[in-house]
């Protein structure tokens, strides 16, 4: 029968709600292989590995290594500097990332001996100077180690550094672990000598020998070493 104006019709209805994850903005964090737990950059003479970690899967980037989760990118850098890279998520979002690599030092420190002598052999040493623009850790001469922790040092007290008469070995090491090693001789004692002639008369001798207590340089071309 037809319902009149006062009739109320009811009907059961079932409603279904469909939920979807809200859109997530791409976020990328940067970390470095030469930054310690305190957040401090440490010197290194090796390449620095930069790691980009995303909060969702990203696309591969030329020159970078993408891990199995597709959320971590890594790349080794051999020079300090500020770099830029564009990271793209799997769903097409883009994020420009700027990062700075620092703490790389692959150059060995310098050491210079100031003195008088012949080549690497000195009869007088007035000074020993060491230098590295990124900082020197220590200087070791023979068995004596001197802490530096500075970019430049000039020493005049060579005995305190460990220099002895004879053969010396000096090693200077910078903060990144690069080292320079040199060997030098130090002899401040003058040689003794005596003349030896073949007939005990120097004026009539055909051969004159000069015997010394240590090796010397030849006076001129007329002499020979035996």
Summary of predicted features, one role per range:
Residues 1-3, 97:
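General secondary-structure propensity
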Residues 21-226:
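Low-complexity, disordered linker/stalk regions enriched in Pro/Thr/Ser/Gly
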